[in-house]
Amino acid sequence: MCGIVGIVSQSPVNESIYAALTLLQHRGQDAAGIVTVDDENRFRLRKANGLVSDVFHQEHMLRLQGNAGLGHVRYPTAGSSSVSEAQPFYVNSPYGVTLVHNGNLTNSVELKEKVFKTARRHVNTNSDSELLLNILANHLDHIPQDHLDPQDIFYAVRKTHKDVRGAYACLAMIIGHGMVAFRDPFGIRPLVLGKREENGKTDYMFASETVALDIVGFEFVRDIAAGEAVYVTFDGELYSQQCAESAVLNPCIFEYVYFARPDSTIDGVSVYAARVHMGEKLGQKIAKEWADEIDNIDVVIPVPETSTDIALQIARVLGKPYRQGFVKNRYVGRTFIMPGQAQRISSVRRKLNTIKAEFKDKNVLLVDDSIVRGTTSEQIVEMARSAGAKKIYFASAAPEIRYPNVYGIDMPSRDELIAYGRNVDEIAELIGVDKLIFQDLTALTESVQLENPAIQGFDCSVFTGEYITGDISPEYLEKIATQRNDNAKKKREKQASNLEIYNEQ
């Protein structure tokens, strides 16, 4: 999972991109990068492992000159955590092209072989984002004229759609031309467009979430549609075109459950409002299925932070007190998206501490957005017991996650998912709770559709095992499980520790 941002302006963009990336930091804490185009048509690039505030210092910001640029925050779902795979990526031909990407390609092995054999392009890392850049650049390279017009750009995007499979929200910047934003035919990963009027001219901005627009004073215009490309020249002229055949919006449902900030709006849906609906529906299910247990519940406590709005609605529906029983250390990364199981285990207790008075001698209903590996849930339950809870009920705002995600979320193996092959009682025993309940999938999708009924479908593959791109085989799932387990990641990081190319130090 990643966060991306791009700005075409009449004034320097380095500080605005930096500010926007800090608002997208929740989407990835592994690495960050910014690239700009200066007055001499040169790319200025800085990228490294770490948080935005750690990667960019004053000397880096001063070098990132120019009125157009891209930014990226990364959590690796493929490849390694090596700085060589931090984004943006860059190729010098044709023109000079740089790209940032959120998502995951599902046919990268075949594509890497094809791009070398047919285009003689070398992809230096295992990143599918570098591969995607080379595919786009190759199609641009086959356009005969020296200067590209908007239709040429859209032609290259159409050809790219025909080549690649999977999830991709992308921004690419072409020297001497402009910036193009495009989204896969299912719109699995989010991408929004904003504008700002300045000195009688219009600046444009693209970002993964609307919250990034807000901080730098851009007005939300609309979402980039599934399969659409939007091109902005460096002179500020905007063009758009549908570039994919049979494009149908199916956004990732997990964006609304977990990833996106509550103050963002994605595909016409307020993330906050969707979570309120999730809480209402889950509260109604609890009231119905646990009717004999409701009187025993003393207090409803959220697991910070995504579930707070959900838990508040559950407490309202059940008529129970809502309390903050955990205090979060905001300077520790999100545990679900931290690379490595050992890191996740050690991080939970550094991330959360209990307010013991809210647990002591009480029957508590803990509410979390989801249960993925079960690592976090098990430790949270242990903390609640240690704080004196008599009985622990647990409610998940998402259904059981039984299948790996192949579209940009780090759920590589069924064996790493606690719900795979287990029923609710078995999961409850493993995480140590007295009673456990999950949201129904229908209730979850309805919670989002209440905010935008025009969305007819979602990517729900982690719950159903049905992959909307239609190209996922059991062999593919086995392959990524082998490639992405923790031991494999450690091996790749050791092998690729020093591949830093085109990087401002």
Swiss-Prot record:
Domain Glutamine amidotransferase type-2 residues, every copy: 2-235
Biased composition (Polar residues): 496-505
Cofactor notes: Binds 1 Mg(2+) ion per subunit.
GO-annotated cellular components: cytoplasm
Catalytic activity line of the entry: 5-phospho-beta-D-ribosylamine + L-glutamate + diphosphate = 5-phospho-alpha-D-ribose 1-diphosphate + L-glutamine + H2O
Region (Disordered): 484-505
Family that this chain belongs to: In the C-terminal section; belongs to the purine/pyrimidine phosphoribosyltransferase family.
Keywords: Glutamine amidotransferase, Glycosyltransferase, Magnesium, Metal-binding, Purine biosynthesis, Transferase
Top EC class of this enzyme: transferase
Cofactor entry: Mg(2+)
Keyword Membrane: no
Gene name, Swiss-Prot/TrEMBL: purF
Protein's recorded name: Amidophosphoribosyltransferase
Positions contributing to Mg(2+) binding: 306, 368-369
Pathway: Purine metabolism; IMP biosynthesis via de novo pathway; N(1)-(5-phospho-D-ribosyl)glycinamide from 5-phospho-alpha-D-ribose 1-diphosphate: step 1/2
Catalytic-site annotation from UniProt: 2 (nucleophile)
Record-linked CDD domains: GPATase_N, PRTases_typeI
